[in-house]
Amino acid sequence: MNFENLLIELGTEELPPKSLRKLAESFLANFTEELTKADLAFSSAVWYAAPRRLAINVTELALAQADKVVEKRGPAVSSAFDAEGKPTKAAEGWARGNGITVEQAERLVTDKGEWLVHNAKVEGVETKSLIAAMAQRALDKLPIPKPMRWGNNKTQFIRPVHTATMLLGSELIEGELLGIKSARTVRGHRFMGQASFELAHADHYLADLKEKGKVIADYEVRKTLIKADAEKAAAKIGGKADIEDSLLEEVASLVEWPVVLTASFEEKFLNVPSEALVYTMKGDQKYFPVFDEAGKLLPNFIFVTNIESKDPAQIISGNEKVVRPRLADAEFFFNTDKKHTLESRLPSLETVLFQQQLGTLKDKVNRISALAAFIAEQTGANAVDAARAGLLSKTDLMTNMVMEFTDTQGTMGMHYARLDGETEAVAVAMEEQYKPKFSGDTVPSAGVSCAVALADKLDTLVGIFGIGQAPKGAADPFALRRAAIGVLRIIVENKLPLDLVDLIAKAQALHGTNLSNANASDEVLEFLMARFRAWYQDKGIGVDVILAVLARRPTRPADFDSRINAVSHFRSLEASSALAAANKRVSNILAKVEGALPTTINANLLTEAAEQALAAKLNELQPLLAPLFANADYQQALTLLAGLRESVDQFFEDVMVMADDEALKNNRLALLNNLREQFLHVADISLLQ
């Protein structure tokens, strides 16, 4: 079979930078799915993307589908011939339809009888005749929330399309994509190189675009180039560039020919908290801030332009002029905000509604303050600081800085708290109350910070559930799933001795008569338990391990985590499978017992050697297990229980539990109940697979 490389490019207006990677990846995934459906073999496939183009390159694509042999079954032999052995009209009609005679048909014998059959050879279709339709279907399935029309064209896409190129090796594939006829014309950079040129071969795409069109079409190459050049530029001025991957991705999506330059701003702006300056540089201008070795912001920034200028100083000056007003705004807001303490802003929180049924932000901070103090008392943190931090927690939302630069909430609260003379614990809690902000973010570690962060999240969870607005489907307007994961992570990762039932009850009490849902506390607990399952699954913990622990309904997250770790370790032991099966058997036996389960073991009724051995082993272990259970050392407890395997196996081998003698039966049931209870101190091991 012959192979050739395929190139498909769509030339467009500037594509949304934050969607560029997703569009390109989806285009490739959709198209390779089409190739697979069409039984077209290929070696590999990659995507390319730049602000004004999406492209895919498929290497060693088969030039035609493989020929197939298709089995076409005809009538049964019994009905294909008459009494004289002549073909019936049905048989002749079937044969004629397949281009053969009845005599040329083969026979197929199955368990249901014998049939006429024709193994027809179907020649594969040429690839070039399939490409356009497959590419169009791949484009039609792209994740485009708001497609647009342009000109008189009825076709819709995320941005207007100007060119389409489909080359199989050197051969131009005829057809249309989004109403644009396939041609060899590829557009270059807007301001450099050739505005357009003819592409002779699919293999020339990257090189020709770079040399003739001054476009680096490979997204990853641009990204790597920008990062390397930015790091070099920062090193030249004795600093280190702050290059977050999300910003790097966005910048790489904005330029076709990246040129990295270094600029500066007035040192007086460094008197403003660096977070505000960084926010405007990164968020508004897409610049990379530069820090010194000590982590202090330098009066410089690195930016990426889309053109090689003969006068880069002019471009640098232009960018410095653009960013200066934003930095001046930050300076003005900071100096203005400093004139008022955070405490003085408390009355203004009464003018901001948190939620109609749950009151204002002032109501919320009052609840957070009380709940944070309650949590601090439970964890040994400073309750006075926790109450103070909770009270001030939302006051920075009323500052000019946060109103203008919203992502600095919490961070500016920390800076203003320090300026106001609040304790360091209160100041840090102002910033850390929102942690974790996203998956993978760190959790607060300081006691006061943990108390405030938990109080804020629990107040929202209980309040929103309390008014009957729990998340439904994918909708989660109050980000309750994130809040729930935050609660669990803070408690687990800091090993805090907190019980969810107590926390929910306290939060509910603080809401007073605001809540209309009588089942709110139960629903919040169930919601948190469901988040536990999702969180551990994301960490790679087996569902059976999670269900085994959930069966015991532990409501202390730190304790829940200890059980998860213990059961995960237990499952790695050689004895675990046999003991899980034995526990399942015990559960089934005990489930059939009517009335209360017997609990007292009479040593005089242990008549079989195997039951005597099991009882002796349990008696030996119980004094060792009791302190382990009391100290939540579940892993060591299960390790000791794993030593029961041989005794349990022998018991089920030799002993008839449901004996005819009622006393013997009840004694054996009591023994099994005792065995099961030891494991249930940790989890329901019978649920392990």
Curated annotation (Swiss-Prot):
GO terms for molecular function: arginine-tRNA ligase activity; ATP binding; glycine-tRNA ligase activity. Signal peptide: none annotated. Gene3D superfamilies: Isoleucyl-tRNA Synthetase, Domain 1. GO terms for cellular component: cytosol. Disulfide bonds: none annotated. The keyword DNA repair does not apply. Its EC number is 6.1.1.14. InterPro entries: DALR_anticod-bd, Gly-tRNA-synth_bsu, Gly-tRNA-synth_heterodimer. Keywords: Aminoacyl-tRNA synthetase, ATP-binding, Cytoplasm, Ligase, Nucleotide-binding, Protein biosynthesis. It catalyses: tRNA(Gly) + glycine + ATP = glycyl-tRNA(Gly) + AMP + diphosphate. GO terms for biological process: arginyl-tRNA aminoacylation; glycyl-tRNA aminoacylation. NCBIfam families: glyS. Belongs to the class-II aminoacyl-tRNA synthetase family. This is Glycine--tRNA ligase beta subunit. It comes from Shewanella baltica (strain OS185).
